[in-house]
């Protein structure tokens, strides 16, 4: 399986090449050159698989066995999920009035990113040990990515991780999950800015191809293909858990409601749809509504500023993975995609061509949900089910309630729940409810923290480059000492 850039200029790479890249050298994102097609028979066979079983099948489709033999791939995936709290890894809660909530948050950091990042870290370690190499992972986070990335690679001998977090823009628990990890391969910076601002120095550093190559830099943000690949399993599992029967022709549709920030989960769902999964995708966003405006009006443009909302991990203005969706919608036309994205990077505003917009609105429905609607949804779900939603999950469930109240004809529907309510006590209190906090999260309050400030007025890019160069020097000196 080969991977090509959405912008069509960078040379194609295999899975290992895509895994170790953030952006492609031409600024695009890697995508499979050809998508496999799943027939009815395969879908019927997969319908009885567990969540880890689905991850194994999907990864085997997109990672050649010449790179990772199937038995070894299965072992890596089992190892990735070994620390999850739920025996199913992912669990579907069936609640009143047809509300299905797929809990993607049973990993160590109580967020869905544990699923894709734990697998991605295993794949990285596999190749690094084989090649006797070291990488420095650079991550910008709006909340959950940083802690899940740190958790997945902390203590790894072939990897260092640098995380930039937006001070004051993620919850106290999210921040503590990052700053209390004191392993020597973990380096956390608290940035005086929002998540889009802290992405700028990262993007600038990654644009220096020679620097990236010299220091073996990579990203674990949602642009990494491996994360999108694993996230496809959410949609397959949601489908098989919620479909009424496989006996009908054609196979029944299931609506999957995807709370969306950087759109990695949406891209995964759209690829799942393209390879044969009969899902209808609903993008649910908070007040940062660029994707909603794109779906409704073809208006892919920045607002004046990021809005702080209760669903803080989705407070994102630039949903990078939409580039993957545009590329697929355009029939893998890299010229169209490159022109769109370069205009967006230049002017922060693009009106989608009519044909592209029409294809997008056929493939995806969207909804934007206010903070008031988030807290109302959390309250209603508790009243009806004694079930606590996190604010991001409430964005998805709000769509379900809207459809139910309008008495729309009922397609089976699954709402993805990206995080546990335990991570967002402030939002739970705002909804007039009582937070439930697990002991591991309470314990964070009493742990030692480590975090280097990046203040307004500091040269963030220079600080980042200096840290990377220092880590490279340390690794070279370590490698020299161990080879003697």
UniProtKB/Swiss-Prot annotation:
It is an enzyme of class 4 (lyase). One of its GO terms (molecular function) is pyridoxal phosphate binding. This is Threonine synthase-like 2. PANTHER family: THREONINE SYNTHASE FAMILY MEMBER, THREONINE SYNTHASE-LIKE 2. The modification N6-(pyridoxal phosphate)lysine is found at residue 113. It comes from Pongo abelii. Transmembrane segments: none annotated. GO terms for biological process: 2-oxobutyrate biosynthetic process; serine family amino acid catabolic process. Belongs to the threonine synthase family.
């Amino acid at each position: 399986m080969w991977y090509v850039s959405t912008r069509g200029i960078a040379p194609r790479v295999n899975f290992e090449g895509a895994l170790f890249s953030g952006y492609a050298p031409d600024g695009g994102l890697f995508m499979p050159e050809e998508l496999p097609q799943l027939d009815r028979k395969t879908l019927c066979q997969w319908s009885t698989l567990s969540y880890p079983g689905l991850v194994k099948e999907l990864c085997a489709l997109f990672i050649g066995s010449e790179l990772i033999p199937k038995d070894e791939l299965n072992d890596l995936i089992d190892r990735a999920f070994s620390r999850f709290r739920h025996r199913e890894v992912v669990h579907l809660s069936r609640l009143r009035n047809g509300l299905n909530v797929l809990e993607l948050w049973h990993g160590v950091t109580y967020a869905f990113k544990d699923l894709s990042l734990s697998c991605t870290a295993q794949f990285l370690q596999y190749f690094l040990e084989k090649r006797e190499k070291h990488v420095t992972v650079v991550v910008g986070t709006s909340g959950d990515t940083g802690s899940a990335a740190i958790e997945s690679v902390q203590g790894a001998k072939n990897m260092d991780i640098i995380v930039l977090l937006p001070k004051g823009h993620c919850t106290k628990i999210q921040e503590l999950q990052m700053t209390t990890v004191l392993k020597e391969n973990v380096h956390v910076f608290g940035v005086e800015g929002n998540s889009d601002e802290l992405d700028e120095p990262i993007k600038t550093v990654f644009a220096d191809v020679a620097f990236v190559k010299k220091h073996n830099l990579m990203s674990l943000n949602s642009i990494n293909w491996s994360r999108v690949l694993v996230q496809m399993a959410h949609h397959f599992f949601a489908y098989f858990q919620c479909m009424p029967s496989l006996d009908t022709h054609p196979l029944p549709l299931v609506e999957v409601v995807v709370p969306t920030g950087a759109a990695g989960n949406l891209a995964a769902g759209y690829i799942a749809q393209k390879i044969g999964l009969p899902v209808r995708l609903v993008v649910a966003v908070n007040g940062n509504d660029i994707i909603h405006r794109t779906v409704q009006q073809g208006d892919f443009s920045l607002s004046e500023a990021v809005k702080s909302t209760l669903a803080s991990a989705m407070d994102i203005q630039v949903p990078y993975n939409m580039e993957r969706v545009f590329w697929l919608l355009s029939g893998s036309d890299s010229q169209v995609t490159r022109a769109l994205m370069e205009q967006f990077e230049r002017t922060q505003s693009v009106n989608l061509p009519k044909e592209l917009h029409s294809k997008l609105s056929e493939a995806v429905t969207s909804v934007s949900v206010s903070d008031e609607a988030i807290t109302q949804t959390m309250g209603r779900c508790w009243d009806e089910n004694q079930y606590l939603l996190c604010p991001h999950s409430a964005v998805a469930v709000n769509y379900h309630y809207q459809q139910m109240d309008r008495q729309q004809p009922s397609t089976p529907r699954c709402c993805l729940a990206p995080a546990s309510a335990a991570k967002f006590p402030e939002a739970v209190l705002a909804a007039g409810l009582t937070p439930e906090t697990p002991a591991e999260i309470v314990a964070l309050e009493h742990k030692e923290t480590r975090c280097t400030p990046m203040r307004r007025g500091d040269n963030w890019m220079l600080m980042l480059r200096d840290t990377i160069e220092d880590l490279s020097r340390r690794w070279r000196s370590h490698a020299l000492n161990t080879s003697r």
